[in-house]
Amino acid sequence: VFSSAATENLESGAVNLEVAKGDRIKVRDCLYGLMLKSANEVANGLAEHVSGSVPSFAKKMNRRAQELGCTNTNFVNPSGLNNAKHLSTPHDMALIAKACFDRADFRAIDRTVSYHFPATQKRPNGTDIVMGHRMISSGNADYYPGILGGKTGYTSAAGNTLVTCAERN
């Protein structure tokens, strides 16, 4: 069940799927909403579901990042939205991405081009979401053969970000 903290504490202009307090959405659907749409309230809701709160989840993220060998990463929230203490490096993000891409369940979600996100209070018919990573879709001019997946991002502080994994030969 989504809380008001998960759904209402987003910075202006943050990408979301209009999930509201009290909405019930399966974890699997949330993962698609997170990876395809970058829905920030969904990231917060998943964090609360897993750890009870966003700060507790951020602590788990930081522990896992250290286990993966990250040395210049500090997470403050699960969405990546602006926070002066939230930081990482390309090298550390590559380590995290590798761990993600090693999982078949992650790759299956991350390679999905479109998905029907289920009904919510504000969208009773659900909504179709489309992967924002243009290199994944073979019908896009930016398509990259051999791509396994990736994640786009944007914040006003960081600008456009991208981590991608591909295999060739």
Label each residue range with its predicted role.
Residues 42-43, 47, 65:
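Small-residue (primarily alanine) positions within well-ordered alpha-helices
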Residues 8-43, 126-149:
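Conserved catalytic neighborhood of penicillin-recognizing serine enzymes
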Residues 2-6, 21-23, 31, 48-50, ...:
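A mature extracytoplasmic/lumenal domain signature
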Residues 1-16, 111-118:
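Short, glycine/proline-biased beta-turn/loop segments that scaffold the active-site neighborhood
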Residues 52-169:
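Penicillin-recognizing serine hydrolase domain
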